[in-house]
């Protein structure tokens, strides 16, 4: 099976890239694509760059040029739910934009005109990730909503405002909704799997710098388990 894995930063893709066999890397429009073999699958690893525009552009190139059957977006995120800690892993059930507001025209907050309010992750991929999470003993793995915006959520006031908009939000980051929207348009199944590098609003910038590598390791190890179970 041809599976695409997307991470925004070098720290988020380095470990998985090192695990690929027969790896070949090429750069298209500034985006790094590495093809290789892992767990019996052909894997295309994309380093997309940070933010929604980079994520949307690179995911479009990915789907047009490499035509993966499924897409997994991995990396770090900021935790939003009160039950979460740094290092925990969140599996998306749904992804939304948290910085889109066209409510003046009767759209839901976060809804892009012409798009659904949220983008549902593939149920089979979520179920598979759930199966893998049962084997995790040292970290908490949960599933829920992830929201995306082009900002790092270190301001407690902004965090509170987003919480008011999305009651059941588990994590925030800067690429997933763009990846999900492109996959939705191309009708390619996707899931977002993110490990928490910080808890949004609580000295997030300090925590992010300290725990990014830990988050990358947790998310990569979990991705490998999913690939091993994927048939």
Swiss-Prot record:
Any one annotated GO CC term: cytosol
Main EC class the enzyme belongs to: hydrolase
Amino-acid positions noted as binding substrate in the UniProt annotation, renumbered to this chain: 78, 153, 174-175
Alphabetical list of CDD domains matching this protein: MTAN
Role of this protein: Catalyzes the irreversible cleavage of the glycosidic bond in both 5'-methylthioadenosine (MTA) and S-adenosylhomocysteine (SAH/AdoHcy) to adenine and the corresponding thioribose, 5'-methylthioribose and S-ribosylhomocysteine, respectively. Also cleaves 5'-deoxyadenosine, a toxic by-product of radical S-adenosylmethionine (SAM) enzymes, into 5-deoxyribose and adenine.
Pathway per the UniProt entry: Amino-acid biosynthesis; L-methionine biosynthesis via salvage pathway; S-methyl-5-thio-alpha-D-ribose 1-phosphate from S-methyl-5'-thioadenosine (hydrolase route): step 1/2
InterPro entries, sorted: MTA_SAH_Nsdase (IPR010049), Nucleoside_phosphorylase_d (IPR000845), Nucleoside_phosphorylase_sf (IPR035994)
Taxonomic superkingdom: Bacteria
EC number per UniProt: 3.2.2.9
Annotated PANTHER family: 5'-METHYLTHIOADENOSINE/S-ADENOSYLHOMOCYSTEINE NUCLEOSIDASE, 5'-METHYLTHIOADENOSINE_S-ADENOSYLHOMOCYSTEINE NUCLEOSIDASE
Biological process annotations from GO: L-methionine salvage from methylthioadenosine; L-methionine salvage from S-adenosylmethionine; nucleoside catabolic process
Catalysed transformations (reactions): S-adenosyl-L-homocysteine + H2O = S-(5-deoxy-D-ribos-5-yl)-L-homocysteine + adenine; S-methyl-5'-thioadenosine + H2O = 5-(methylsulfanyl)-D-ribose + adenine; 5'-deoxyadenosine + H2O = 5-deoxy-D-ribose + adenine
Active site: 12, 198
Gene Ontology molecular function terms on file: adenosylhomocysteine nucleosidase activity; methylthioadenosine nucleosidase activity
One Pfam entry name: PNP_UDP_1
Keyword Lipid biosynthesis: no
Annotated keywords: Amino-acid biosynthesis, Hydrolase, Methionine biosynthesis
UniProt record similarity statement: Belongs to the PNP/UDP phosphorylase family. MtnN subfamily.
Protein name in UniProt: 5'-methylthioadenosine/S-adenosylhomocysteine nucleosidase
């Amino acid at each position: 099976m041809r599976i695409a894995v997307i991470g925004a930063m070098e720290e988020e893709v380095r470990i998985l890239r090192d695990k690929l066999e027969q790896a070949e890397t090429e750069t298209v429009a500034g985006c790094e694509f590495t093809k290789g073999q892992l767990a019996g699958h052909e894997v295309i690893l994309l380093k997309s760059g940070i933010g929604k525009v980079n994520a949307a552009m690179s995911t479009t190139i990915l789907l047009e040029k490499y035509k993966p059957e499924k897409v997994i977006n991995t990396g770090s995120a900021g935790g939003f739910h009160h039950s979460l800690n740094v290092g925990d892993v969140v599996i998306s059930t749904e992804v939304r934009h948290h910085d889109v507001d066209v409510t003046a025209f009767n759209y839901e907050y976060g809804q892009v005109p012409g798009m659904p309010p949220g983008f549902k992750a593939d149920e089979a991929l979520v179920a598979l990730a759930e199966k893998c999470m049962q084997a995790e003993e040292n970290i908490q793995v949960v599933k829920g909503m992830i929201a995306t915006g082009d900002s790092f959520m270190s301001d407690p006031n902004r965090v509170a405002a987003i919480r008011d908009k999305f009651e059941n939000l588990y994590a925030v980051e800067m690429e997933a909704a763009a990846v999900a929207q492109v996959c939705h348009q191309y009708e390619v199944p996707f899931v977002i799997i993110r490990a928490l590098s910080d808890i949004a609003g609580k000295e997030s910038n300090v925590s992010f710098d300290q725990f990014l590598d830990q988050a990358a390791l947790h998310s990569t190890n979990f991705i490998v388990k999913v690939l091993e179970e994927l048939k």
